[in-house]
């Protein structure tokens, strides 16, 4: 092998296109886009023998696993023999000069790059000969081609405990943990999530990222937890509401009992008041009957006394009696034809009135006049007005 040709060395060190395909990267758990690998003419010549073997994951035939592993060259030996720090090809510009001193090596901690590939095609071939190996580790010390693996999928410096997985020769198979490949975020799960995942029979890794199925399971579990929490909250609110209603009912029932007691007391008081009222009504009825009888007797007595006493007081006694000198004749307002009977009646009435008005001496004179008239064979004639009436009749 001529190591002086840098392009051929690059072509040999360049993996096939479908090594870092999307499926291989997803199987490794590396959620990063596959790098675009530029294919040159010499790379096509170097990979022509690989691609002609078959359509497996690495482009290998089932009978050529050893030849595939021999194609990888340890870059540490190449850089250790003759390599300049500024040259990316891994060889010096003048490989024919054996007298050139080797380039001084850096005193800093060695930088190691590992490319991990899941060789699924090799599992079937190595099933009978030995244990199956799922990962291939290739050490690329101090050689960082940008077209192979992006920066997010590479580890610039390995920890000290990672040197235990580094084998002295390239192409050897060694299991490399995922923590040494890229910095992963830790997945924190609560006790409830762990319990539900255990019930589902699913065990999630402790680091992100997760696969689609694992994400679906985790979302389902968290949705169950949220539904459970919301149901618990609703039950708690319902219980608080019911407790509040029960407390209000208890308070209302206690107040109702107190009011019932007050109502009973008021009813008893009302009954006593009604009994007292009836007693008063009976007493008033008895006293009212007695008073009515007494008052009736008093009124009858007073009325009888009034009937006895009032006739003795005549209202005509205070008036002076009219004498004959006080009499004045009046003119006749109308001419009437009077019969003898009417004349006598009128005369009698006038005589009675005159006698009542005349003093006692005049009464004696009237009596003598009456007797005189009776002796003459006729009724006594009134004086004054009576003579005027008779004179009018005669006319």
Swiss-Prot record:
Domain bZIP, residue spans: 217-280
Region annotation Disordered: where it falls in the sequence: 79-110, 354-387
Compartments reported by the entry: Endoplasmic reticulum membrane
Cytoplasmic side of membrane: 1-295
PROSITE patterns: BZIP
Cited SMART domains: BRLZ
GO cellular component, one term: endoplasmic reticulum membrane
Lumenal topological segments: 317-395
SUPFAM superfamilies: Leucine zipper domain
Taxonomic placement: Eukaryota, Metazoa, Chordata, Craniata, Vertebrata
Location (main, coarse): endoplasmic reticulum
Protein family membership: Belongs to the bZIP family. ATF subfamily.
Record note on quaternary structure: Binds DNA as a dimer.
Annotated region described as Leucine-zipper, given as residue ranges: 259-280
Encoding gene per record: CREB3L4
Organism: Macaca fascicularis (Crab-eating macaque)
CDD domains on file: bZIP_CREB3 (cd14689)
Gene Ontology terms describing biological process: response to unfolded protein
PANTHER family the UniProt entry points to: AGAP001464-PB, CYCLIC AMP-RESPONSIVE ELEMENT-BINDING PROTEIN 3-LIKE PROTEIN 4
Keyword match NAD: no
Name of this chain's protein: Cyclic AMP-responsive element-binding protein 3-like protein 4
